[in-house]
Curated annotation (Swiss-Prot):
Induction details: Expression increases gradually during the log phase of growth.
Positions annotated to bind a divalent metal cation 2: 105, 168, 201, 232
Cofactor binding summary note: Binds 2 divalent metal cations per subunit. Has a high-affinity and a low affinity metal-binding site. The true nature of the physiological cofactor is under debate. The enzyme is active with cobalt, zinc, manganese or divalent iron ions. Most likely, methionine aminopeptidases function as mononuclear Fe(2+)-metalloproteases under physiological conditions, and the catalytically relevant metal-binding site has been assigned to the histidine-containing high-affinity site.
Protein name according to UniProt: Methionine aminopeptidase 1
One Gene Ontology term from the biological process aspect of the record: proteolysis
Stated family: Belongs to the peptidase M24A family. Methionine aminopeptidase type 1 subfamily.
Residues the record lists as binding substrate: 77, 175
Gene Ontology cellular-component annotations: cytosol
List of residues binding a divalent metal cation 1: 94, 105, 232
InterPro entries registered for this protein in UniProt: Creatinase/aminopeptidase-like, Pept_M24, Pept_M24_MAP, Pept_M24A_MAP1
Keyword Metal-binding in annotation: yes
Required co-factors: Co(2+); Zn(2+); Mn(2+); Fe(2+)
């Protein structure tokens, strides 16, 4: 069931989203060669708690980190640990913050030091695909128009959209209905209504679209070992369009 949020709930979620955005800004200062993914996790946890929220992901289905940290060929759900970032890496950081019972959720992929032109293009296309999808986020539109816009743009740029992992509703639960694929035909699915809160999060591979989960039962990687990127915003559908909740 899709739960439309009240103005009061949206106010809380806007603040939760702002905390997520501020946490991204804080981590961005520290993303450089020589730092470990565990150190980034610790910085994020301290910062989120300082804002009066709690990390959404810590303990979620047994997840050990406060954030998901995925490097290079790792797509999503990377567990923070001893891995040290190197010049030329790309790192996807997925952050959730829970405030007064409601979640904010946003992911960004960052360059570490100097990255290749190919990796720059991967990041640019993935981020732009998010905004191509958001252009379709209007009341009365079908949900799959978002999906179709993302897939069309990504594939026209000669990249691949991951199909096993999808966007989702957000609220008192981190993952609510509806599920939002980032591929598919237009004009399908429920019509968007004011008060819906959605996490749109295209995951894009430089090579084939296929992924697998490692033995830790969390970290998802590309099958071909090529790099991948992930960009996500939590948005609210309004009377006239959408409002990005996960920004300052």
């Amino acid at each position: 069931m899709i739960i439309c949020k009240t103005p009061r709930e949206l106010g809380i979620m806007r603040e939760a989203g702002r905390i997520v955005a501020l946490t991204h800004e804080e981590l961005k200062k520290h993303i450089k060669p020589g730092i470990s993914t565990k150190e980034l996790d610790q910085i994020a946890e301290r910062f989120i708690k300082k804002q009066g929220a709690i990390p959404s992901f810590k303990g979620y289905n047994g997840f050990r980190g406060s954030i998901c940290v995925s490097v290079n060929e790792e797509l999503v759900h990377g567990i923070p640990g001893s891995r040290v970032l190197k010049d030329g890496d790309i790192i996807s950081i997925d952050i959730g913050a829970k405030l007064n019972g409601y979640h904010g959720d946003s992911a960004w992929t960052y360059p570490v030091g100097n990255i290749s032109d190919d990796d720059k293009k991967l990041l640019e296309v993935t981020e732009e695909s998010l905004y191509k999808g958001l252009q379709e986020a209007k009341p009365g539109e079908r949900l799959s128009n978002i999906s179709h816009a993302i897939q069309t743009y990504v594939e026209n740029e000669q990249f691949s959209v991951v199909r096993e992992y999808v966007g989702h509703g957000v609220g008192q639960d981190l993952h609510e209905d509806p599920q939002i694929p980032h591929y598919g035909p237009p004009n399908k699915g429920p019509r968007l209504k004011p008060g819906m809160v959605l996490a749109i999060e295209p995951m894009v591979n430089a090579g084939s679209r296929y992924v697998k989960t490692l033995a830790d039962n969390w970290t998802v990687v590309t099958v071909d070992g090529k790099k991948c990127a992930h960009f996500e915003h939590t948005i609210a559908i309004t009377e006239t369009g959408f409002d990005i909740l996960t920004r300052v």
